[in-house]
Amino acid sequence: WRASAPSPQAWLKDYTLARYGTSNTAAQKAWELVRNSALNCETSLQGPHEAVFCARPSLTVDRVSSWGGTGIFYDTQMMVGAAHNLLAAQLSGSNYSYDLTDFSRQALTDYGHQLLASINEASKSQNEAEAYAKRRDAYLQLMLDLDELLSTNENFMLGRWTNMARGIADEAEGTTEADRQ
């Protein structure tokens, strides 16, 4: 326990040292950007905003689940900056790999929200057919890019989580063979 609250900057400096095993200015800057954006919600939310790619297909998605947030409450360019800063840190290790994947994923999914809104706008006008097609193709490519990014870290791969669930089902009393499939 501490006698007084630490300054956020000092805490983040200690956190990045503990997380990555080295002091790194770019990593500290990345976390400072995340602290001032995605981790700095100043309003009450029932749930966080969710990746638009997880919603049922629609041009007017405002949430993925019934409890999800309806908008992004932070400057999305700060997450882009966080991903760039963490990449520039050029560290190694599983924590660094996880965070770099996660920050990049968040920046790309935030862009997906913006891109879908622009696709919706372009779809409303016959004069925007070419813009619509370009944005649609960019959106579909963004999904593929996200899949490729997430496949670089086992923590973001579905197989890891389904295997863990199957392992738990094998241990639990009262499960049937069908439960374990």
Whereabouts are the PLM-identified features?
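Substrate-binding groove of N-acetylhexosamine-processing glycoside hydrolases
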Residues: W1-Q181
